[in-house]
């Protein structure tokens, strides 16, 4: 692990966690639970608390069980980041996004025994997506970054193998 990569890890974590927590602070201090502020015909701010993980999975787990699970995942992700080759920059960036999102949601879980969610996508009377937050978005974008990186490596390897035939 180089000093430069450690710097970018810490910078990425600081940015993701601060952005997530700043928005959640604003939501919790300006909106009552259960209130909605329509922004566009398809998106609203809708203040809720989620006692589970993504899409309310594991909501039957105990509060401390979810905290322990989240910490375990964060520790594993730090190990994964440390052991991912430096040339896999997109994967390493994705792992940082996932860790930052997990830490942001962990802070909520410790403070409120639930995660503050507030983004609602919907088509009036037709479709409503699960309510989520910026930390969830970071986690999703991080996973997509890793998948894209792995897919590009697979394509590159496949082309190399095809040329060697």
Swiss-Prot record:
Catalysis performed (reactions): Release of signal peptides from bacterial membrane prolipoproteins. Hydrolyzes -Xaa-Yaa-Zaa-|-(S,diacylglyceryl)Cys-, in which Xaa is hydrophobic (preferably Leu), and Yaa (Ala or Ser) and Zaa (Gly or Ala) have small, neutral side chains
Compartments, record wording: Cell inner membrane
Question: What is the enzyme's class at the highest EC level?
Answer: hydrolase
Query: What biological function has been recorded for the protein in this entry?
Result: This protein specifically catalyzes the removal of signal peptides from prolipoproteins.
Q: What is its EC number?
A: 3.4.23.36
- NCBIfam families, alphabetized: lspA
Q: Any idea what this protein is called?
A: Lipoprotein signal peptidase
A GO MF annotation of the entry reads: aspartic-type endopeptidase activity
Q: Which HAMAP family match?
A: LspA
Give the protein family: Belongs to the peptidase A8 family.
Q: Where are the bilayer-spanning segments?
A: 7-27, 28-48, 61-81, 87-107, 128-148
According to the entry, what is the taxonomic lineage of the organism? Bacteria, Pseudomonadati, Pseudomonadota, Alphaproteobacteria, Hyphomicrobiales
Alphabetical list of InterPro entries matching this protein = Peptidase_A8
Keywords assigned: Aspartyl protease, Cell inner membrane, Cell membrane, Hydrolase, Membrane, Protease, Transmembrane, Transmembrane helix
Topology in the lipid bilayer: Multi-pass membrane protein
Pathway(s) where this gene product acts? Protein modification; lipoprotein biosynthesis (signal peptide cleavage)
User: From what superkingdom does this record's organism come?
Assistant: Bacteria
Q: Where is this protein primarily located?
A: membrane
Per the Swiss-Prot or TrEMBL record, the active site comprises 117, 136
Instruction: Please provide, in alphabetical order, the Gene Ontology terms of the cellular component aspect for this entry.
Output: plasma membrane
Protein's GO biological process: proteolysis
């Amino acid at each position: 692990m180089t000093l430069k990569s450690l710097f970018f890890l810490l910078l990425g974590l600081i940015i993701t966690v601060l952005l997530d927590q700043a928005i959640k602070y604003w939501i919790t201090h300006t909106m009552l639970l259960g209130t909605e502020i329509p922004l566009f015909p398809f998106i609203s701010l809708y203040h809720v608390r989620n006692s589970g993980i993504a899409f309310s999975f594991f909501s039957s787990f105990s509060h401390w069980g979810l905290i322990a699970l989240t910490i375990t995942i964060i520790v594993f992700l730090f190990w994964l980041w440390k052991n991912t080759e430096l040339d896999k920059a997109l994967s390493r960036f994705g792992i940082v996004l996932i860790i930052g999102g997990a830490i942001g949601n962990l802070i909520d879980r410790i403070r409120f025994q639930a995660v503050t969610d507030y983004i609602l996508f919907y088509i009036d009377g037709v479709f409503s997506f699960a309510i989520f937050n910026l930390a969830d978005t970071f986690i999703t974008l991080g996973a997509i970054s890793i998948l894209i990186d792995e897919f590009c490596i697979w394509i590159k390897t496949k082309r190399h193998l095809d040329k060697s035939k």
